[in-house]
């Protein structure tokens, strides 16, 4: 408890002392980033005994919430101060000539990659399925085998919407997996779907945004096994990155909704900011996958003794970064015409496996 109190005091002091947004973001990364102090304490919960988790969990969740709230409040103060300073110094020159009219538009890289992924999996027999961005707790968590108390159910990871009295609480979906649940409940196997869409998580830095794009896939049939999953994803990676030889590996991992679960890594090389998939001797994780958990199948009315399946999920924004060399996610959402002209694609060219993706 003393360690938690000391970390909180130090974190709050550092937040209060942050003189600008860059300094505040450095504090956020140091405390709440993947390798931050608070995140490290949260990660240690999984190694504790049930009694220790019961005692330490609420304290650590409260610590993370207080630090996160303090960062948000300080960010508002700093942003308002920066805006005031900008308004004092900026002037609009009304004598300037009007800007030239818009030229031909460009397809955003995210949409281009969506189309490329759909073309590849469409060639494998997948159809596209979609669902609502606002979900209830059952479809987003419970049906997918997320236990009560799982960190993803906390407010620092998920955007919860204020529920009307007597109404079921709603969330901005944290993944497109609820569409898999809805499809399994509405359709009978065999099922082979691709699920693209926007998802929402409470994070913001060079490689994470509060809203991002995800594609998931689901196959439910008789006799499906891990070999089918591996073959499907290896073929996808070769087609997407347009290379014939890709060395890959599947590392054991944990996801509540799959068992066994894995993360797929591919070998790559780096030359400055340029990344080449299929060369070099470094490993990079590109997606998560696994065999659909029997509990998820049962929740959706499918007998796991008769039908099996696999699922996978990947971040479209990150795949676009890797394939087309964009170093930062944040410009994706800034509507900068110069950025769009540089990284955009012709809207008249439709990707296809036979005709070429990009």
From Swiss-Prot:
One of its GO terms (cellular component) is cytoplasm. Its EC number is 6.1.1.20. It is an enzyme of class 6 (ligase). Binds 2 magnesium ions per tetramer. Its cofactor is Mg(2+). It catalyses: tRNA(Phe) + L-phenylalanine + ATP = L-phenylalanyl-tRNA(Phe) + AMP + diphosphate + H(+). Keywords: Aminoacyl-tRNA synthetase, ATP-binding, Cytoplasm, Ligase, Magnesium, Metal-binding, Nucleotide-binding, Protein biosynthesis. It comes from the Bacteria. InterPro entries: aa-tRNA-synth_II (IPR006195), aa-tRNA-synth_II/BPL/LPL (IPR045864), Phe-tRNA-synth_IIc_asu (IPR004529), Phe-tRNA_ligase_II_N (IPR004188), Phe_tRNA_ligase_alpha1_bac (IPR022911), Phenylalanyl-tRNA_Synthase (IPR002319), tRNA-bd_arm (IPR010978). One of its GO terms (biological process) is phenylalanyl-tRNA aminoacylation. It is found in: Cytoplasm. Belongs to the class-II aminoacyl-tRNA synthetase family. Phe-tRNA synthetase alpha subunit type 1 subfamily. Tetramer of two alpha and two beta subunits. NCBIfam families: pheS. This is Phenylalanine--tRNA ligase alpha subunit. It comes from Hyphomonas neptunium (strain ATCC 15444). The gene is pheS.
């Amino acid at each position: 408890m003393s360690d938690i109190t000391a970390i909180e005091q130090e974190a709050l002091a550092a937040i209060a002392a942050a003189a600008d947004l860059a300094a505040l973001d450095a504090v956020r990364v140091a405390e709440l980033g993947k390798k931050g102090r608070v995140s490290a304490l949260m990660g240690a919960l999984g190694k504790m005994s049930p009694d220790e988790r019961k005692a330490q969990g609420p304290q650590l969740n409260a610590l993370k919430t207080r630090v996160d709230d303090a960062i948000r409040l300080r960010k508002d103060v700093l942003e308002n101060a920066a805006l005031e300073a900008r308004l004092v110094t900026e002037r609009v020159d009304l004598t300037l000539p009007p800007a030239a009219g818009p030229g031909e538009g460009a397809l955003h890289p995210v949409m281009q990659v969506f189309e490329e992924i759909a073309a590849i999996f469409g060639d494998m027999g997948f159809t596209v399925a979609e669902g609502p961005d606002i979900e209830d707790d059952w479809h987003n968590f419970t049906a997918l085998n997320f236990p009560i108390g799982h960190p993803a159910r906390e407010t620092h990871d998920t955007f919860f919407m204020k529920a009307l009295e007597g109404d079921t609480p709603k969330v901005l979906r944290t993944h497109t997996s609820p569409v898999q649940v809805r499809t399994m409940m509405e359709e009978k196997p065999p099922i082979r779907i691709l699920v693209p869409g926007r998802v929402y998580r409470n994070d913001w830095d060079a490689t994470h945004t509060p809203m991002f794009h995800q594609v998931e896939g689901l196959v439910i049939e008789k006799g499906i096994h891990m070999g089918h999953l591996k073959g499907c994803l290896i073929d996808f990676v070769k087609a997407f990155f347009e290379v014939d030889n890709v060395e890959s590996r599947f590392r054991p991992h944990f996801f509540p909704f799959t068992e066994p679960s894995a993360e797929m890594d591919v070998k790559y090389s780096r030359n400055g900011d340029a990344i080449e998939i299929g060369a070099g001797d470094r490993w990079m994780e590109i997606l998560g996958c696994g065999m659909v958990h029997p509990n998820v199948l049962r929740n959706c009315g499918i007998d796991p003794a008769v039908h099996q399946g696999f699922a996978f999920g990947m971040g479209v924004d990150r795949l676009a970064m890797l394939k087309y060399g964009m170093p930062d996610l944040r410009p994706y959402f800034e509507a900068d015409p110069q950025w769009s002209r540089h990284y955009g694609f012709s809207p008249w060219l439709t990707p296809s496996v036979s005709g070429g993706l990009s």
